[in-house]
Curated annotation (Swiss-Prot):
CDD domains: Radical_SAM. This is Lipoyl synthase. [4Fe-4S] cluster 1 binds at residues 68, 73, 79, 308. It holds the Pfam family LIAS_N. The gene is lipA. It comes from Escherichia coli (strain K12).
Length: 321
């Protein structure tokens, strides 16, 4: 498929086609240049995939999406097999084109007005007690999708009054005031927004995003709801140093964030940003110790940790790595 000149609405652009649209060019990694995964990065697949197929079927039946599938998460088999999933609202096409992410880029269609009801019913049918709701970036919407988040939260709580809801939100670039007015009126139980990496390489990792803007989003939500935990996550292995990661942790604490996730970046395809290093489990343990010493109440740090990986256990302060 050649580089599209005009993107067609509703078409998913992935891998080389997606990367061709990024202003900061990324050269595809030659296979012989790929870093070999260390032993600690090997995943054991479950012997029985019945539960996995059941969750996928429930998603398809209601026209829902999971970030687990759309972003090719390495923990999909484990989480689905335990009956948990992170739901991705507002469609499966992102208006951003971050070169670390496997979610498709393009011109998305209008949000499904029935999605909040379908999502709430699916969650009730699955009898979930803790759910994570995330979304693609929707720079095409005046509120960045904030009202859709609020509608989903309201619908879920109507069907499942005892449930705990964590939202993993985009940065609402250029729409922070409007988005926060909506989100603070219908708050989740945990408010999550990922910084992803360090300021020095932000333009390469998150083109179109701004490090300080993301910190401000987290801070302003916390100011509006001091009683609600705020959370953020980073990937390691993109060219940053451990010292830079620790400095980002300090920035997060200065902006009121109390929950942290650190995990290893994995290259979705050779067209995405390459893995520069694999961080050892011992290094993750050291960074967790630093985080707790800084005052984070929860810190999940490990090779396979993702922002929503065992989020229910993270919220309880249980060991996740």
């Amino acid at each position: 498929m050649s580089k599209p000149i005009v993107m067609e609405r509703g078409v998913k652009y992935r891998d080389a086609d997606k990367m061709a649209l990024i202003p900061v060019k990324n050269v595809a990694t030659e296979r012989e240049a790929l870093l070999r995964k260390p032993e600690w990065m090997k995943i054991k697949l479950p012997a029985d995939s019945t539960r996995i197929q059941g969750i996928k079927a429930a998603m398809r039946k209601n026209g829902l999406h999971s970030v687990c599938e759309e972003a090719s998460c390495p923990n999909l088999a484990e989480c689905f097999n335990h009956g948990t999933a992170t739901f991705m609202i507002l469609g499966a096409i992102c208006t951003r084109r971050c070169p670390f992410c496997d979610v498709a880029h393009g011109r998305p269609v209008a949000p499904d007005a029935n999605e909040p009801v379908k999502l709430a019913q699916t969650i009730a049918d699955m009898a979930l007690r803790y759910v994570v709701i995330t979304s693609v970036d929707r720079d095409d919407l005046r509120d960045g999708g904030a009202q859709h988040f609020a509608d989903c939260i309201t619908a879920i709580r109507e069907k499942s009054p005892q449930i705990k809801i964590e939202t993993l939100v985009p940065d609402f670039r250029g729409r922070m005031d409007r988005a926060l007015d909506i989100l603070t009126a219908t708050p989740p139980d945990v408010f999550n927004h990922n910084l992803e990496n360090v300021p020095r390489i932000y333009r390469q990792v998150r083109p179109g995003a701004d490090y300080n803007w993301s910190l401000k989003l987290l801070e302003r939500f916390k100011e509006a709801h001091p009683e609600i935990p705020t959370k953020s996550g980073l990937m390691v292995g993109l060219g940053e140093t451990n010292e830079e990661i620790i400095e980002v942790m300090r920035d997060l604490r200065r902006h009121g964030v109390t929950m942290l996730t650190l995990g290893q970046y994995l290259q979705p395809s050779r067209h995405h940003l390459p893995v520069q290093r694999y961080v050892s489990p011992d290094e993750f343990d050291e960074m967790k110790a630093e985080a707790l010493a800084m005052g984070f109440t929860h810190a999940a740090c490990g090779p396979f940790v993702r922002s929503s990986y065992h989020a229910d256990l993270q919220a309880k302060g249980m060991e996740v790595k």
